[in-house]
């Protein structure tokens, strides 16, 4: 079957940069979907996206749709005709469904059957509808109209190229008649660009100062920015999201180095970086020590004969932004950080839970409680907790919300607070996302945990539980944050006690009954997803969850031990035995509560198992005390042989009540060895 390259390019006014890649991928996916439905194949695909265009190139697209056979079975003959041979409603309905007369239906078989061969259409006749459907299905939250037209799109359209080989597809989409003329760079090549063939699309546009391939532009910007930063003896900060956005803003990227006055370096560099990245889309430069350099890189969309003019323009634009940050910083420092708490007394945290200041007081007390139990300084934690929300009332955070915590850190240092207290004001928000940085100090960890637990307890206490995708107070993230800090920083905190302490601080503001249990269940339930992501089988998680350890660190240590135990050759057999023993004990009320009496043993295997259990108890007890659960389980794995021999030789439910009770007591003792670590019966 013959094939031709296919190109479609929709030209527009400047597209939303943050949505450009999504729109391009969806455009390609929609066209692929339409071609698949039509039974049309192609060899390769390529999507192009630039500020003023979306394009798709398909290599070797079939030019003719293949013929299709339709075979539909209808009702059985006996149901299709009555005794006189007249068609029933079932037969007539089937014919109507097929869109033909009953006489065109095959009646020779046991069922009515409709067969038809549909001749394929030329691909050129199908493409307009396929492209139109793809454009209509693009994920555009809000479409716009322009001029007096009825058509709607994310931005006004300007031109349309649609070629199948050398043939222009005759159609009009979104008010644009298809042709072979594209447009070049708005300034370097404003006139039309004739696309010589689909395969030459990128080359034709390159000659007109347009790099249509977003990946090519991205790579060019990244590489050139890195080179320029190196020439400035620095390293560029290039967040992937910012790189994507800048890539979507330019058709012909030209990175340039600009500078600003060194006096602005007295302002917290995070504020300067925030305003330059978010507002101006600049790449900031850091020196070898991670300090901000008074230079930045802008990406121009033009190859200027006088680049210094562009540089001067950008330096002029950024100066007021940096001046604002400098002003806010100086204004805020005119009063002590603690004084901002007065403003927070009038700022509502949650209507039923009081002000932001009330929250800070609770966090202060809870942080001190936690610090005492993880080896931190309670006084520092209390102080950091009390100051934790002060910067929310500052001018700096009011202008740059991303500076919360960071601003507090600088203002606390300015006031002479201890370094750990200052650091904790920023670290309270850690981790800020999955895999993000954790607190580096015990004070920061204590405040971070306290802040999150206070939010969890408070919001749960007024019944505002997260449902489905709705989690306005980010409670899931808070719970995961608490767990990550405790486990990854190896902090042994009894969460049960900490949550009970947190509940007590709210008094009558929350429903106390069962609240601590509800919060703890929610927090520890988050571990299931964490372990699944790490490749830990859910049965391992459940084996530890059954014991309900109060410490997240202890929980994790048990999980890691059980995960290692699962790999031992004895694991499956012992898990099955534990399950069997668990079932037996659950049905034998009270039989497992007695002490084991060797005088009632009737079989040598009972003596052997009892001796093995005693040895295991002596070996395992100190290991469990040290939380060396992996070694303890490895030691318990040696019980497999005497356990197997016992079950083969001994009937548990002996006729003699005393013997029976004694055997159940020994099984309870055996199970207790494992349950001190995890309920491994869940592994079976």
UniProtKB/Swiss-Prot annotation:
One of its GO terms (biological process) is glycyl-tRNA aminoacylation. One of its GO terms (cellular component) is cytosol. SUPFAM superfamilies: HD-domain/PDEase-like. Its EC number is 6.1.1.14. It is found in: Cytoplasm. The keyword Cytoplasm applies. GO terms for molecular function: arginine-tRNA ligase activity; ATP binding; glycine-tRNA ligase activity. The lineage of its organism: Bacteria, Pseudomonadati, Pseudomonadota, Gammaproteobacteria, Pseudomonadales. This is Glycine--tRNA ligase beta subunit. Keywords: Aminoacyl-tRNA synthetase, ATP-binding, Cytoplasm, Ligase, Nucleotide-binding, Protein biosynthesis. InterPro entries: DALR_anticod-bd (IPR008909), Gly-tRNA-synth_bsu (IPR015944), Gly-tRNA-synth_heterodimer (IPR006194). PANTHER family: GLYCINE--TRNA LIGASE, CHLOROPLASTIC_MITOCHONDRIAL 2, GLYCYL-TRNA SYNTHETASE. Its main location: cytoplasm. Tetramer of two alpha and two beta subunits. It is an enzyme of class 6 (ligase). Belongs to the class-II aminoacyl-tRNA synthetase family. It catalyses: tRNA(Gly) + glycine + ATP = glycyl-tRNA(Gly) + AMP + diphosphate.
């Amino acid at each position: 079957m013959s094939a031709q390259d296919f190109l479609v390019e929709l030209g527009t006014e400047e597209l939303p940069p943050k949505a450009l890649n999504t729109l391009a991928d969806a455009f390609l996916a929609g066209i692929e979907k339409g071609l698949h439905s039509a039974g049309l194949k192609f060899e390769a695909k390529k999507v192009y996206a630039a500020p003023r265009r979306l394009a798709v190139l398909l290599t070797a697209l079939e030019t003719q749709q293949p013929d299709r056979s339709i075979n539909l079975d209808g009702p059985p003959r006996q149901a299709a005709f009555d005794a006189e041979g007249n068609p029933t409603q079932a037969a007539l309905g089937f014919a109507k469904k097929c869109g033909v007369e009953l006489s065109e239906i095959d009646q020779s078989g046991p069922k009515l059957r409709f067969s038809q061969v549909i001749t394929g259409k030329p691909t050129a006749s199908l493409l307009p509808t396929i492209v139109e459907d793809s454009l209509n299905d693009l994920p555009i939250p809000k479409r716009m109209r322009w001029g007096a037209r009825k058509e709607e799109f994310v931005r006004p359209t300007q031109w349309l190229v649609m070629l199948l080989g050398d043939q222009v597809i005759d159609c009009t989409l979104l008010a644009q008649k298809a042709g072979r003329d594209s447009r070049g760079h708005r300034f370097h090549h404003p006139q039309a660009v004739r696309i010589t063939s689909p395969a030459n699309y990128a080359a034709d546009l390159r000659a007109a100062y347009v790099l249509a391939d977003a990946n090519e532009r991205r790579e060019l910007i990244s590489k050139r920015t890195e080179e320029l930063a190196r020439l400035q003896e620095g390293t560029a900060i290039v967040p992937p999201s910012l790189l994507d956005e800048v890539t979507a803003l330019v058709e012909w990227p030209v990175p340039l180095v600009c500078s600003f006055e060194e006096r602005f370096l007295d302002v917290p560099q995070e504020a300067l970086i925030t305003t330059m990245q978010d507002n101006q889309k600049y790449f900031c430069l850091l020196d070898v020590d991670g300090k901000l350099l008074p230079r930045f890189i802008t990406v121009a969309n033009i190859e200027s004969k006088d680049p210094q003019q562009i540089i001067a323009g950008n330096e002029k634009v950024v100066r007021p932004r940096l001046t604002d940050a400098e002003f806010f910083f100086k204004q805020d420092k005119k009063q002590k950080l603690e004084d901002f708490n007065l403003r927070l007394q009038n700022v509502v945290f949650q209507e039923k839970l009081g002000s932001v200041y009330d929250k800070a007081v609770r966090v202060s007390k809870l942080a001190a409680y936690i610090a005492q139990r993880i080896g931190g300084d309670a006084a520092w934690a209390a102080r950091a907790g009390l100051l934790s929300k002060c910067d929310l009332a500052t001018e700096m955070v009011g202008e740059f919300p991303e500076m919360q915590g960071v601003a507090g850190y600088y203002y606390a240092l300015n006031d002479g607070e201890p370094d750990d207290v200052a650091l904790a004001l920023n670290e309270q928000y850690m981790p800020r996302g999955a895999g993000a940085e954790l607190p580096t100090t015990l004070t920061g960890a204590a405040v971070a945990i306290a802040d999150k637990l206070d939010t969890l307890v408070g919001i749960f206490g007024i019944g505002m539980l997260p449902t489905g995708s709705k989690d306005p107070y980010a409670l899931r993230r808070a719970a995961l944050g608490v767990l990550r800090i405790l486990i990854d920083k190896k902090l042994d905190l009894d969460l049960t006690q900490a949550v009970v302490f947190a509940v007590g601080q709210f008094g009558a503001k929350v429903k106390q009954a069962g609240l601590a249990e509800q919060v703890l269940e929610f927090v520890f339930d988050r571990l299931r997803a964490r372990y699944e992501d790490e490749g830990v089988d859910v049965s391992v998680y459940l084996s530890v969850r059954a014991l309900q350890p109060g410490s997240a660190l202890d929980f994790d240590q048990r999980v890691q031990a059980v995960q290692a135990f699962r790999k031992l050759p004895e694991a499956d057999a012992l898990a099955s035995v534990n399950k069997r023993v668990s079932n037996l004990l659950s049905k034998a009320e009270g039989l497992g509560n007695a002490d084991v009496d060797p005088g009632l043993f009737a079989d040598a295997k009972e003596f052997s198992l009892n001796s093995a259990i005693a040895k295991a108890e002596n070996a395992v007890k100190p290991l469990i005390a040290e939380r060396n659960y992996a070694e303890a389980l490895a030691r318990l794995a040696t019980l497999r042989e005497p356990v197997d021999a016992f079950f083969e030789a001994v009937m548990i439910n002996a006729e003699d009540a005393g013997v029976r009770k004694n055997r159940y007591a020994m099984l309870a003792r055996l199970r207790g060895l494992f349950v001190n670590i995890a309920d491994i019966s869940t592994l079976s």
